[in-house]
Amino acid sequence: MTDMKTADSLSVPNRRVIIGSIAASIAFVMELTLVPLLLPGIQEQFALSIGQLAWVFNSYGISVAIGVLLGGLLGDVYKATRVFAAGVICFATGAAIVAFAGSYELMIFGRVLQGFGGGVFSPLIPLLLTRSSPHRPGKVLIIWGSVAGYVAAFAPFFYGNTLAENGWTYAFVIIGIVSLVALAIVWSARLDDRPPSFDRSLSSYAELLKSGRLWVMLIYVFCTYGSITYFLFRLPLWLADNGFQVASIGFTLSVMWLSFSVVSTFLRNLVDEPHVRMILMSAPLLIAAGFPIAYVYPEYAGLIVSSILVGSGLACSNAPSTQLILKFAPRGMGAASASLDITCARLGGVVTVALLAQSVLAYSFVLVVGLSFVAFTCALVAAKKFD
């Protein structure tokens, strides 16, 4: 009973770190979900070509990829809260520059700075969360994931129906304010999070490369997130080609994100070690089942079922994979491993979309099933000891 009480109770500083970290994640997710909605307004205001607009979108993603690697490296060497603070400040400053940019060039600079900052602090979020809740790391990670999912589902709908008429700049102002509030909450905890004095020479990074089970989980992330990213990319285009209206497409994607959040909430008390393997194996099965349903039953009901299955698969993949990646990381390499987690997820999406963007849907489903099989095998191998 005493052990259970210790596991469920958190100190005030730890609670603040958890709340602040999740708030920072909300700002990060708002950027991902709102910016596609804002692109037409940005294009109109600055009279941009499609190529220039693509740079507005892609400059952020490229900077995130660079920032993630640096954030993971620095988070293992210096205090995670300080590195987190530096990333959030860059992110918020970049958002402000974008909001008040008077030229295309200044906007690109703001997007680069914002993306770099987001890349620096984003891999530290799971690290701060698990350090603040060491007895129930899986629970806090799944709460984080479910909150992010609800924000992803409702942010575009809320902004589009309340503030969109006032222009696109308000979105970046709100994103910047939310990130700074998150930083204030984390900083007020005054957490002493000095990294353990482990060896971080080249040999320690060699240990990272030698961690077989860690890399098995990274392959799992590559395959599952690659499949899900392709679903998010391909489904709206396919629906538009088949005469579906924008509102119907948006609703279908919202169903996917809501399914992710609801299932994540349901799993929050099941995600720790006794159930990890079962949950991990469920993810690729759900993803593989969701894709052909959208193809075989293209009616609206079939698309909703498909979105529910893929969203549920994302929930079953998200927190457990992060939990095991941090668990399998060599001592003192937690932040570096978290950055590899994010990098593999993004790389899986980029590679899968690049390979399948112009393929026939039937062929793409075959490859998705293949990726799901690889992910299922990885789950069997990596979580073997949790039977």
Over which residues does each language-model region extend?
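Helix-loop-helix hairpin linking two adjacent transmembrane segments in secondary transporters
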Residues: 135-138, 142-187
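Helix-breaking motifs and short loop linkers at transmembrane-helix boundaries and internal kinks
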Residues: 47, 79, 100-106, 117, ...
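Helix-to-loop junctions at the C-terminal end of transmembrane segments
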Residues: 68-79, 262-275
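Extracytoplasmic
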Residues: 16-50, 71, 231-236
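A late C-terminal transmembrane helix in Major Facilitator Superfamily
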Residues: 328-361
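Conserved MFS/SLC helix-loop-helix module at the cytosolic interface between two early adjacent transmembrane helices
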Residues: 65-102
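Paired small-residue
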Residues: 94, 105-114, 301-309
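Cytoplasmic helix-loop-helix junction between adjacent transmembrane helices
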Residues: 110-148
